[in-house]
């Protein structure tokens, strides 16, 4: 079977650094699904307005030339323990496919280059190919009693985020709120913990410079 993208994702993240590790972690992060020309037909979205969430099947396109292995080291385990690639959500997979649940914010049927699907809470970088879109169905897709393997035992680390007023003024209120949440999740690689190092993250067309000391992340400047 050969498959082609049906859409591409438009996101504030030009690179994968800083992209949330899972969908739904930054619930106010806005993104847009832009269908490819041959699928820009409003009929293909008929009835979508009756759903709140969508499943996106997409490609880890930044990893096209990366090697894969039957075992991986999940960041949540500190890179010290191996698990099977199919028992993980590692982006380094044989077929490079990702699966994300996103909330529908707005559907623009008559937009330029539309129809467009605006969504919240995605974990995709800008330009990510999307291969399928399906509605999220509560009775079939929700399993609150399910075990989550090693993830259950390793809570996410949340940081306090300090953003100077001069930096905050360069973003809209929505962009700033999402940026704070993204940074609070600590976008650094888990093995890096140098309080003197300044990291850079492309977000909404600007290079956000920050450093982390203890549990406090401070934005240094925006270029």
Where are these regions (language model features)?
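Mixed-charge, low-complexity intrinsically disordered regions
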Residues: 1-97, 109-223
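Conserved positions in beta-strands of structured domains
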Residues: 102-105
